[in-house]
Amino acid sequence: MDDDKYLKGTTTVGVVCTDGIVLASEQRATMGHFIASKTAKKVYQIDDLVGMTTAGSVGDAQQLVRLVSVESQLYKMRRNESMTIKGIATLMSNFLNANRYYPMMVQLLIGGVDKNGPAIYSLDAMGGSIEETRISATGSGSPMAYGVLEDQYKEDIAVKEGLDLAIRAIHNAMKRDSASGENIDVVVITKEAFKRLDPEEVKSRRDSLN
């Protein structure tokens, strides 16, 4: 499989912090060289304290969001407790692997906070699942994003600093990757809440980094 077929047009990042996680993406969607959308959603809420970023086919990604959201809610209704981050990642991994001969053209980050603390898992189109203990990036702009993440990540980073790191990584990727652009969507998940940052706050933080 040619990775370029499903990594085009996206940069998403995940940062594991001491008090939660940060998920972020830019909002450009492309069809070849055509900019199809400037407000594409690539960070989704799939449970109270769990989010997922998507890189790749929009249709495949939206189907997977619906699937995992429903399964997560059904689990909660049956067990009277939320599924763990690892459990959700395993569920998604199994589904992707079962469809490996007709693969979903996606690359995902699933992250949040559960009874075991903050965690992020990265998944490929074949269902391979890796727990990311620090940082992760997906999509065509990920090499540029990793340059910032690897250079500036600290083991004791808090969400407040993780926010700026994620924004800086996406911003840096947008400078060099023509398929990534427009605004930046940022989600912060702590043990208290799932919070999507207001666009004005993101813009203010982004401007202060220049």
Curated annotation (Swiss-Prot):
GO terms assigned for molecular function: endopeptidase activity; threonine-type endopeptidase activity
Q: Any keyword Nucleus?
A: no
Query: InterPro entries from the xrefs?
Result: Ntn_hydrolases_N, Pept_T1A_Psome_bsu_arc, Pept_T1A_subB, Proteasome_bsu_CS, Proteasome_sua/b, Proteasome_suB-type
Localization in the cell: Cytoplasm
Q: Which reaction does it catalyse?
A: Cleavage of peptide bonds with very broad specificity
| Keyword tags | Autocatalytic cleavage, Cytoplasm, Hydrolase, Protease, Proteasome, Threonine protease, Zymogen
Name the UniProt record assigns to this protein: Proteasome subunit beta
